[in-house]
């Protein structure tokens, strides 16, 4: 099955599959040593260099579980990317650390870390995992925002790609087509679902409990980044206007990568209006619960917009 066919299959066929998950997190503190910050930065620069010219080095710089979601919304595995070098079709980063006016951010959470590289309309999130051989690239998600932001909808979606309709929330509020495999992954996934319940009900206290203060949300349908404060303000504006739409996109597919106090959540979601998108989120164990540290959304360009009038019923 080709990647494009596989993506369409997810978007059309997986929508009806529904199962659930929940659990309770452990509580441990996270602290990053300065040497870890520098090691992650060095790993990111080595990854950039390998992507540009050296598949052998790329294999050495990436984790066996490495995946890459490019700006078109194409998901590729490590082996697919290495094979693409031989075919002359290897993906290229949309923005480099050497770009003019680049904005760089590095965060380390135990054995999981990320580097954000932003310049112009290009946004790149590189996620790194620490193993016995040091830091290796685990995941990349990228996006390019439109030159001109789309006109605001009548309901003023809090996140541009998540515009909703008035309908019951079945997936993910009640049932989800995914069961995390480990206690930490179950806890992070359960806290993500509780965060989304806050979004659905426009209860920003509940939503905010599961979001770190320095979080950045980056959406391929938006313009710039969205801070925690801005996301809350967007939703409260909706609430004051009486907007009651469901802006919690159903989950079609998910994957978790568990690093104890930090968990990477990868999802394919279908908004009620618009294209399906891949999301990459990192959840960190703080204050006895998992909280979102970063969230990137990249629409799948090869799949047309959907316009769903209501949530599909639970089976």
Where are these regions (language model features)?
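N-terminal secretory signal peptides that target proteins for export/translocation
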Residues: 1-6
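Bacterial N-terminal signal peptides
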Residues: 9-21
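Short, low-complexity N-terminal intrinsically disordered segments enriched in polar/charged residues
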Residues: 26-64, 138, 144-205, 209, ...
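Surface-exposed, charged secondary-structure patches
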Residues: 37-39, 80-122, 230-277
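Hydrophobic pocket/interface hotspot
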Residues: 57-59, 66, 81, 115, ...
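A mature extracytoplasmic/lumenal domain signature
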Residues: 62, 72-73, 118-120, 126, ...
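A short gly/proline-enriched turn/hairpin at secondary-structure junctions
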Residues: 65-76, 80, 88-93, 214-226, ...
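Short beta-strand edge/turn micro-motifs at domain boundaries
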Residues: 123-173, 276-306
């Amino acid at each position: 099955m080709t990647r494009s066919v596989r993506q369409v299959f997810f978007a059309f066929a997986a929508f009806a599959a529904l199962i659930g998950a929940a659990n309770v997190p452990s509580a441990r503190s996270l602290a990053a040593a300065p040497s870890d910050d520098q090691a992650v930065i060095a790993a990111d620069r080595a990854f950039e260099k390998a992507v540009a010219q050296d598949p052998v080095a790329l294999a050495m710089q990436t984790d066996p579980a490495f995946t890459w979601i490019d700006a078109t919304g194409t998901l590729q595995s490590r082996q697919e990317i290495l094979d693409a070098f031989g075919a002359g079709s290897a993906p290229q980063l949309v923005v480099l650390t050497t770009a003019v006016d680049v904005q760089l951010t590095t965060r380390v959470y135990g054995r999981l870390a990320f580097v954000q590289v932003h310049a112009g309309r290009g946004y790149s999130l590189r996620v790194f995992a620490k193993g016995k051989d040091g830091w290796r690239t685990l995941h990349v998600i990228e996006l390019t925002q439109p030159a001109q932001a789309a006109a605001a909808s009548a309901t003023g979606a809090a996140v541009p790609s998540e515009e909703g309709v008035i309908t019951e929330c079945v997936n993910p509020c009640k049932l989800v087509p995914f069961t995390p495999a480990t206690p930490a992954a179950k806890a992070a996934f359960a806290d993500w679902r509780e965060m989304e319940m806050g979004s659905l009900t426009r209860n920003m206290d509940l939503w905010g409990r599961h979001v770190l203060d320095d979080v950045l949300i980056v959406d391929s349908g938006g313009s710039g980044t969205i801070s925690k404060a801005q996301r809350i303000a967007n939703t409260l504006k909706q609430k004051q206007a009486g907007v009651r739409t469901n802006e919690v996109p159903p989950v079609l597919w998910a994957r978790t990568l568990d690093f104890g106090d930090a968990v990477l959540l990868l999802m394919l979601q279908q908004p009620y209006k618009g294209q399906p998108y891949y999301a990459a989120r990192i959840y960190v164990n703080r204050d006895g619960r998992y909280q979102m540290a970063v969230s990137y959304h990249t629409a799948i360009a090869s799949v047309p917009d959907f316009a769903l009038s209501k949530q599909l019923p639970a089976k």
